[in-house]
Amino acid sequence: MTQNLWNMTNTKHFITLAFVLLLAMILSGCNEKPGAAQQTRITPAEAQAIAKEAYIFGFPIVMNYKTMWSYSIDKNSPDYKGPFNEVSCAARLFTPDDKAVVTPNADTPYCMFWMDVRAEPLVLSVPEMEPERFYHFQLVDLYTHNFAYVGTLTSGNSAGKFLIAGPDWDAEKPIGITDVVRSETGFVFSVTRTQLFGPDDLDKVKAIQASYSLQPLSTLLGTEAPPAVPEPDFPEWAEGSQFDERFFGYLDFMVGLLGHPAEGDQKLWDDLARLGISPEGDFDFSALSKETQEALKAGVQEGFAEIEAFAEKSTKDPLASAKTFGTRDFLSRSAKDNYQLERSDLLRSAAAHTGLYGNSAAEAIYPAYFTDADKEPLDASKHSYTLTFARDALPPAKSFWSLTMYDGKTQLFIDNPLDRYLLNSTTMDDYVRGEDDELVFIISKDSPGKDLEPNWLPAPDGPFYAVMRLYGPEEAALSGDWTPPALEKDKQP
């Protein structure tokens, strides 16, 4: 009897002790920072693997935020364009003195602006334009997908009103709206290009840009505006943070703006949550163990190395730009068909690394020249070059095409006596034709003489590269049936 009583008493003590320990663990967990809680459920090896995957997925998203911060949030930024939901344009002629943007585009002056369509859609109004003038509004979501275009190749050059809606708007198209385009994210970036025919056309382009406008749908309809959506607590951008552990704090914020995983991303988001990255936005790198912190740093380095390697390989493909920019569906197909990848994250990241906001292939492609026909680097201090188009083999473009020269060291335009930085199809009547009506461009540091100067693209006294731009490429250019001719060195035109 005494023994049984002793057993019962001790059993009660054990049960009580176990309950107290369990309660202490629960209370301790409640007071623990989310990041610290996560580290108990993940090994350093797992953390590094997830960090690498997160980096490749999130790199273009974080770089997109960098643009958002400098263009529309930080009014002290030299790149500040204006607030959200306001069209910001700059019609000007770029020269060698412009050093802020590398590989600048002299064909189509830009408008660049951010839109917040969380509370309600915005209505974009565009004027009627001459049928020969190319223009478009490239619309980019937070993932950096080109989810839609408004412009010459998609909607024509008639005047119109285009409704840009976020993921939560599901009403019918209002009367008076030309078309509706839908973003899967609540913030949208636009790169707007309007063709410039030459220096004498600049005032006309300015007038066209001034007539682009945005307004909330409720303003257009004359109805009461919906309740405002709280403004996010935008984190200040720190340059260089995209290359170290600070990256994960920005990714955590952007995951909050995304709100929920896209189709096919649930497993990735579950993995992100194991690092403490979630829509709640409570990631805390300092709360992680030293081992987990080092694992995340290693994941960043590993992820960036993979992005760099993929980008380097892509530069050897003249049609790379046609494969790495586009809609979500297009990039998913391209990843599988062209690169045998299950996900498109690496395509988006490599594209963001080499140049954010490239066009979808149907709008423009950019064959680039870094080497000559003998695969040797281009250097005008050693050689002159010719680029020859047969009469029936000009670049196949629905709108127009151009060839632009860049200094190989600065990646900028080259100072030259003609103030000429490109040759394009809008001045075809000015070019000198060969015996078989072929078109031969001359690329050299010295003038080929007055008679051939119309065909001369001045080069620096040193290394250079050139970029061909085809706006509205024909199927032959997209399929590879037409390929850009090679640059021949020291060949007389």
Where are each of the predicted segments found?
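A compositional/structural signature for long, glycine/proline-rich flexible linkers
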Residues: 31-493
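C-terminal motif of bacterial Sec signal peptides marking the signal peptidase cleavage site
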Residues: 26-29
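Bacterial N-terminal signal peptides that target proteins for export
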Residues: 4-18
